[in-house]
């Protein structure tokens, strides 16, 4: 302003100053057009000194990258027309830029996070339901017997029924194998469980009929248990016999050195002929003697 001080005084100086300020862009606190509830913030970036006259002033975005690359300006300021008299000196130039930030109406709303937590939106999976057999089923005279049998013979798939009866299974060829005997034992055990269920149903009838049915079913159960025991014993006996045969074969193979020779009937006849003619070694055997042997 020292340049204009001696030339413009009073009203002329004020007019010149107002005209100069009209061409300059200053930030205002009023909201911009089309953007409600906004406030302006001013940041300054220092430009490096111009070394030569041919150097062009870079854009505000490039100037921001030279000084502070982490905070580039969003909108470049308008470039006002400059007269020859108003050109600044070749020194550091301050460039003012405006950053427009949207200010919410409610200040409490800014404290809340933008997106809700994923943990709140996730649906909690319900735990799996386990079905427990009610204790009311074990009521009656045969409750303890039923409970003990279920605990003793409980297994995976014990309730699977077979298409064949006990007699049809026994009539099958090769039914003496161990696997088939075990299958029959499993079927009999499942049959026992069915009998126990029948006992539980029979306890709801009259006293005399209930006692008779219970005695009959318990007797059938005892018979089936005896049959199972006999099958198990026969299986065990066969296993023991097979082990004995295997041990005998192993011991014979260990002691046999090939010196013992067992002659068949034909070998004995030939041995007699050879032994009878041993004294007459010079004479050859007759063909008729050899042909008379029935091979």
From Swiss-Prot:
Residues 1-30 are annotated as: Binding to monomeric RNA-free nucleoprotein. Residues 70-81 have a biased composition (Pro residues). It comes from the Viruses. Residues 125-131 are annotated as: Binding to host phosphatase PP1. The keyword Cell membrane does not apply. It holds the Pfam family Pneumo_phosprot. The modification Phosphothreonine is found at residue 152. Keywords: Host cytoplasm, Phosphoprotein, Viral RNA replication, Virion. Residues 263-281 are annotated as: Binding to RNA-directed RNA polymerase L. Residues 51-122 are annotated as: Disordered. Residues 281-295 are annotated as: Binding to the N-RNA complex. InterPro entries: Pprotein_pneumovir. The keyword Manganese does not apply. GO terms for cellular component: host cell cytoplasm; virion component. Constitutively phosphorylated by host. Its main location: virion. Belongs to the pneumoviridae phosphoprotein P family. Plays critical roles in regulating RNA replication and transcription through its interactions with multiple proteins. Tethers the RNA-directed RNA polymerase L to the nucleoprotein-RNA complex. Recruits the M2-1 protein, a processivity factor that is required for efficient transcription of viral RNA. Acts as a chaperone for neo-synthesized nucleoprotein by forming an N-P complex that preserves N in a monomeric and RNA-free state and prevents the association of nascent N with host cell RNAs. Recruits the host phosphatase PP1 to inclusion bodies to regulate viral transcription. The N-terminus is important for viral particle assembly. The oligomerization region is central. The C-terminus part contains binding regions for the RNA-directed RNA polymerase L and the nucleoprotein. Homotetramer. Interacts with protein M2-1; the interaction between the two tetramers is required for the anti-termination and elongation transcriptional activities of protein M2-1. Interacts with host phosphatase PP1; this interaction recruits PP1 to the inclusion bodies. Formation of a complex PP1/M2-1/P allows P to target host PP1 phosphatase to the M2-1 substrate. Interacts (via C-terminus) with the nucleoprotein N (via N-terminus); the phosphorylated phosphoprotein P binds to N-RNA complex. Interacts (via N-terminus) with the monomeric RNA-free nucleoprotein N. This is Phosphoprotein.
């Amino acid at each position: 302003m020292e340049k204009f001080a001696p030339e413009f005084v009073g009203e002329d100086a004020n007019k010149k100053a107002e005209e100069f300020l009209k061409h300059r862009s200053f930030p205002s606190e009023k909201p911009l057009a089309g953007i409600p509830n906004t406030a302006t913030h001013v940041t300054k970036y220092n430009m490096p000194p111009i070394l030569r006259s041919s150097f062009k002033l870079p854009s505000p975005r490039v100037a921001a990258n030279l000084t502070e690359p982490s905070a580039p300006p969003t909108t470049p300021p308008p470039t006002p027309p400059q007269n020859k008299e108003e050109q600044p000196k070749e020194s550091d130039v301050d460039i003012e830029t405006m950053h427009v930030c949207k200010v919410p109406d409610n200040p409490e709303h800014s404290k809340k996070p933008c997106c809700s937590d994923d943990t709140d939106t996730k649906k909690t999976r319900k735990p799996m339901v386990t079905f427990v057999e009610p204790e009311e089923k074990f009521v009656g005279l045969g409750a303890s017997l039923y409970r003990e049998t279920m605990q003793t013979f409980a297994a995976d798939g014990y309730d699977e029924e077979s298409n064949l009866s006990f007699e049809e299974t026994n009539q099958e060829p090769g039914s003496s194998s161990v696997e088939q005997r075990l299958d029959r034992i499993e079927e009999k055990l499942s049959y026992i469980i069915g009998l126990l269920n029948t006992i539980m149903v029979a306890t709801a009838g009259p006293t005399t009929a209930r006692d008779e049915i219970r005695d009959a079913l318990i007797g059938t159960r005892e018979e089936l248990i005896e049959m199972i025991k006999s099958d198990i014993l026969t299986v065990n006996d066969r296993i023991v016999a097979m082990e004995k045969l295997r041990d005998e074969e192993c011991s014979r193979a260990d002691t046999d050195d090939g010196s013992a020779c067992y002659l068949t009937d034909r070998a004995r006849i030939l041995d007699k002929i050879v032994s009878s003619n041993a004294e007459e070694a010079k004479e050859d055997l007759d063909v008729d003697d050899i042909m008379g042997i029935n091979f």
